[in-house]
Protein backbone atom coordinates (compact mmCIF):
# COMPACT_ATOMS: atom_id res chain seq x y z
CA UNK A 1 0.00 0.00 0.00
CA UNK A 2 1.47 3.40 -0.94
CA UNK A 3 2.41 5.76 1.82
CA UNK A 4 -0.22 8.42 2.45
CA UNK A 5 0.88 11.95 1.66
CA UNK A 6 -0.26 14.68 4.01
CA UNK A 7 -2.84 16.95 2.47
CA UNK A 8 -1.87 20.60 2.15
CA UNK A 9 -4.01 22.74 4.39
CA UNK A 10 -6.39 25.01 2.51
CA UNK A 11 -5.45 28.66 2.38
CA UNK A 12 -6.64 30.52 5.45
CA UNK A 13 -5.98 33.80 7.20
CA UNK A 14 -3.39 35.97 5.50
CA UNK A 15 -2.63 33.31 2.90
CA UNK A 16 -6.30 33.36 1.91
CA UNK A 17 -6.07 37.15 1.57
CA UNK A 18 -3.07 36.81 -0.77
CA UNK A 19 -4.90 34.19 -2.82
CA UNK A 20 -7.98 36.46 -3.00
CA UNK A 21 -5.91 39.39 -4.30
CA UNK A 22 -4.14 37.19 -6.82
CA UNK A 23 -7.42 35.62 -7.97
CA UNK A 24 -9.16 39.00 -8.28
CA UNK A 25 -6.38 40.37 -10.49
CA UNK A 26 -5.64 37.13 -12.36
CA UNK A 27 -7.63 38.24 -15.40
CA UNK A 28 -5.64 41.49 -15.65
CA UNK A 29 -2.11 40.65 -16.81
CA UNK A 30 -1.23 44.35 -16.90
CA UNK A 31 -1.67 44.43 -13.11
CA UNK A 32 1.11 41.87 -12.72
CA UNK A 33 3.35 43.80 -15.13
CA UNK A 34 2.81 47.04 -13.19
CA UNK A 35 3.40 45.24 -9.87
CA UNK A 36 6.69 43.82 -11.15
CA UNK A 37 7.73 47.28 -12.37
CA UNK A 38 6.96 48.76 -8.95
CA UNK A 39 8.99 45.99 -7.35
CA UNK A 40 12.06 46.82 -9.42
CA UNK A 41 11.57 50.57 -8.88
CA UNK A 42 11.32 50.16 -5.10
CA UNK A 43 14.16 47.65 -4.67
CA UNK A 44 16.53 49.02 -1.99
CA UNK A 45 14.64 52.36 -2.33
CA UNK A 46 16.62 53.08 -5.53
CA UNK A 47 13.68 54.60 -7.41
CA UNK A 48 12.86 56.94 -4.53
CA UNK A 49 16.50 57.98 -4.24
CA UNK A 50 16.60 58.76 -7.96
CA UNK A 51 13.37 60.80 -7.84
CA UNK A 52 14.60 62.70 -4.80
CA UNK A 53 17.91 63.47 -6.50
CA UNK A 54 16.04 64.66 -9.58
CA UNK A 55 13.84 66.88 -7.42
CA UNK A 56 16.93 68.35 -5.72
CA UNK A 57 18.49 69.15 -9.10
CA UNK A 58 15.34 70.58 -10.70
CA UNK A 59 14.16 72.57 -7.68
CA UNK A 60 17.12 74.36 -6.07
CA UNK A 61 14.80 76.34 -3.76
CA UNK A 62 13.46 73.10 -2.33
CA UNK A 63 16.72 71.14 -2.52
CA UNK A 64 16.94 70.52 1.21
CA UNK A 65 13.45 69.00 1.29
CA UNK A 66 14.24 66.71 -1.64
CA UNK A 67 17.47 65.57 0.00
CA UNK A 68 15.58 64.89 3.23
CA UNK A 69 13.09 62.85 1.17
CA UNK A 70 15.84 60.72 -0.34
CA UNK A 71 17.60 60.28 2.98
CA UNK A 72 14.33 59.45 4.70
CA UNK A 73 13.38 56.86 2.08
CA UNK A 74 16.77 55.21 2.43
CA UNK A 75 16.61 55.35 6.25
CA UNK A 76 13.16 53.75 6.09
CA UNK A 77 14.50 50.95 3.91
CA UNK A 78 17.39 50.41 6.34
CA UNK A 79 15.00 50.37 9.31
CA UNK A 80 12.86 47.72 7.59
CA UNK A 81 15.92 45.57 6.89
CA UNK A 82 16.96 45.79 10.56
CA UNK A 83 13.49 44.78 11.74
CA UNK A 84 13.46 41.88 9.23
CA UNK A 85 16.71 40.56 10.70
CA UNK A 86 15.27 40.67 14.21
CA UNK A 87 11.79 39.26 13.45
CA UNK A 88 12.96 36.73 10.81
CA UNK A 89 9.47 35.95 9.46
CA UNK A 90 9.63 33.88 6.29
CA UNK A 91 7.88 34.98 3.11
CA UNK A 92 4.58 33.34 2.13
CA UNK A 93 5.09 29.71 1.21
CA UNK A 94 1.90 27.93 0.23
CA UNK A 95 1.03 26.05 -2.96
CA UNK A 96 -1.93 28.36 -3.56
CA UNK A 97 0.30 31.47 -3.60
CA UNK A 98 2.03 32.36 -6.87
CA UNK A 99 5.37 34.09 -6.34
CA UNK A 100 5.76 36.45 -9.28
CA UNK A 101 9.08 38.19 -8.60
CA UNK A 102 12.46 37.38 -7.10
CA UNK A 103 13.48 38.76 -3.72
CA UNK A 104 16.87 39.54 -2.19
CA UNK A 105 16.05 37.59 0.99
CA UNK A 106 13.51 35.14 2.38
CA UNK A 107 12.53 37.53 5.18
CA UNK A 108 9.19 39.31 4.89
CA UNK A 109 8.32 41.38 7.98
CA UNK A 110 7.98 44.28 7.40
CA UNK A 111 7.80 45.01 3.69
CA UNK A 112 10.79 47.25 2.93
CA UNK A 113 9.04 48.36 -0.28
CA UNK A 114 5.99 49.56 1.68
CA UNK A 115 8.25 51.16 4.30
CA UNK A 116 10.42 53.17 1.90
CA UNK A 117 7.45 54.07 -0.32
CA UNK A 118 5.48 55.46 2.61
CA UNK A 119 8.42 57.52 3.84
CA UNK A 120 9.16 58.72 0.30
CA UNK A 121 5.52 59.65 -0.36
CA UNK A 122 5.27 61.72 2.81
CA UNK A 123 8.66 63.39 2.46
CA UNK A 124 8.44 64.03 -1.29
CA UNK A 125 5.00 65.60 -0.81
CA UNK A 126 6.54 67.87 1.80
CA UNK A 127 9.47 68.70 -0.50
CA UNK A 128 7.13 69.54 -3.38
CA UNK A 129 4.85 71.64 -1.18
CA UNK A 130 1.91 69.28 -1.69
CA UNK A 131 -0.51 68.01 0.96
CA UNK A 132 1.08 65.00 2.66
CA UNK A 133 -2.04 62.89 2.21
CA UNK A 134 -2.03 63.43 -1.54
CA UNK A 135 1.36 61.80 -2.08
CA UNK A 136 0.62 59.01 0.35
CA UNK A 137 -2.77 58.28 -1.23
CA UNK A 138 -1.28 58.21 -4.72
CA UNK A 139 1.86 56.16 -4.05
CA UNK A 140 1.37 53.88 -1.06
CA UNK A 141 -1.69 51.76 -2.06
CA UNK A 142 -0.29 50.65 -5.44
CA UNK A 143 3.04 49.60 -3.90
CA UNK A 144 1.35 47.94 -0.93
CA UNK A 145 -1.06 45.98 -3.13
CA UNK A 146 1.76 45.01 -5.50
CA UNK A 147 3.65 43.23 -2.70
CA UNK A 148 0.62 41.06 -2.01
CA UNK A 149 -0.18 40.49 -5.70
CA UNK A 150 3.40 39.38 -6.29
CA UNK A 151 3.03 36.82 -3.49
CA UNK A 152 6.06 38.01 -1.55
CA UNK A 153 4.36 39.55 1.50
CA UNK A 154 1.54 38.89 3.90
CA UNK A 155 -0.89 41.80 4.38
CA UNK A 156 0.47 42.35 7.91
CA UNK A 157 4.00 42.74 6.47
CA UNK A 158 2.70 45.53 4.26
CA UNK A 159 0.69 47.21 7.04
CA UNK A 160 3.71 47.15 9.35
CA UNK A 161 5.84 48.60 6.55
CA UNK A 162 3.41 51.48 6.05
CA UNK A 163 3.43 52.23 9.79
CA UNK A 164 7.23 52.04 10.02
CA UNK A 165 7.62 54.25 6.93
CA UNK A 166 5.30 56.88 8.42
CA UNK A 167 7.25 56.79 11.69
CA UNK A 168 10.60 57.21 9.91
CA UNK A 169 9.17 60.11 7.88
CA UNK A 170 7.95 61.78 11.09
CA UNK A 171 11.42 61.45 12.62
CA UNK A 172 13.02 62.84 9.45
CA UNK A 173 10.71 65.87 9.50
CA UNK A 174 11.35 66.46 13.18
CA UNK A 175 15.11 66.27 12.67
CA UNK A 176 14.98 68.56 9.65
CA UNK A 177 12.81 71.16 11.40
CA UNK A 178 15.04 71.00 14.47
CA UNK A 179 18.19 71.44 12.41
CA UNK A 180 16.67 74.38 10.52
CA UNK A 181 15.81 76.06 13.81
CA UNK A 182 19.13 75.19 15.36
CA UNK A 183 17.34 73.29 18.12
CA UNK A 184 18.75 70.06 19.49
CA UNK A 185 16.38 67.16 19.13
Where are these regions (language model features)?
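Membrane-embedded catalytic cores of phosphoryl/pyrophosphoryl-handling enzymes
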Residues: 96-185
Amino acid sequence: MPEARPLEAPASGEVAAIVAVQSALNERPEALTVAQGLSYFGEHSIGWLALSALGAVLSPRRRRGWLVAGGGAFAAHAAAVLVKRVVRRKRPHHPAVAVNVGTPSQLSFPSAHATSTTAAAILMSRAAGLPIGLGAAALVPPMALSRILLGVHYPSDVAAGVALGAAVAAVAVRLDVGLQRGVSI
